[in-house]
């Protein structure tokens, strides 16, 4: 609940559609940010997948809800850290080693079709060895600057809230698997 207004904000279930009674739900700022432009069914499935992978619930995993990314480059991380005025203390060998490991949040593995990136576990710190974890782009975006505990706690609450929600069986591969950028177009 937003303390200033006394109520949650709102979000569209499917961002491709207009704000209508059928397509609008109450949504806190954290959930709204984490969901981004994802279809609500994908967001709920990702929440269940992560909670299952983390062994916080007995549920299903939906690896198809986490898209593949191949353009993960050391130089882009160096540039991004400099641009955001973050300490960057990783060498290329460490970077190359960490991005081939499974995502610490959802378990997505790097392979010839996908490469994980690097998450700063504590977003208040820079890219130092002790603070870096292998992370897929989708989990990195969802976690954002939230603490790991806040992030998992919110996903757990989402999954509990939607434990009896049946996600649409009519989702086509486009909605299930494509990233935010593609859905926004």
Walk through the language-model features, giving the residues of each.
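Histidine-centered nuclease catalytic patch
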Residues: 1-26, 102-134, 143
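Proteins with a high burden of low-complexity, intrinsically disordered sequence enriched in S/T/G/P/A and R
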Residues: 1-3, 93, 183-184
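Contiguous alpha-helical segments
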Residues: 20, 30, 34-104, 110, ...
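Long C-terminal interaction/binding lobes of large macromolecular proteins
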Residues: 168-184
């Amino acid at each position: 609940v937003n303390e200033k207004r006394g109520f949650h904000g709102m979000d569209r279930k499917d961002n491709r559609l207009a704000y209508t009674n059928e397509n609008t739900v109450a949504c806190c700022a954290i959930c709204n940010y984490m969901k981004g432009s994802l279809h609500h069914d994908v967001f709920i499935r990702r929440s269940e997948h992560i909670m299952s992978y983390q062994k916080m619930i007995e549920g299903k995993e939906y690896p198809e809800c986490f898209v593949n990314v191949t353009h993960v480059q050391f130089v882009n991380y160096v540039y991004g850290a400099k641009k955001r005025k973050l300490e960057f203390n990783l060498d290329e060998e460490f970077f190359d080693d960490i991005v081939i490991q499974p995502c610490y949040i959802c378990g997505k593995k790097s392979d010839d079709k996908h490469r994980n990136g690097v998450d700063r576990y504590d977003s208040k710190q820079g890219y130092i060895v002790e603070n870096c974890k292998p992370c897929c782009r989708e989990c990195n975006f969802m976690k954002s600057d939230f603490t790991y505990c806040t992030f998992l706690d919110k996903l757990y609450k989402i999954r509990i809230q939607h434990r009896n929600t049946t996600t649409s069986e009519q989702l086509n591969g486009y909605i299930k698997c494509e990233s935010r950028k593609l859905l926004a177009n």
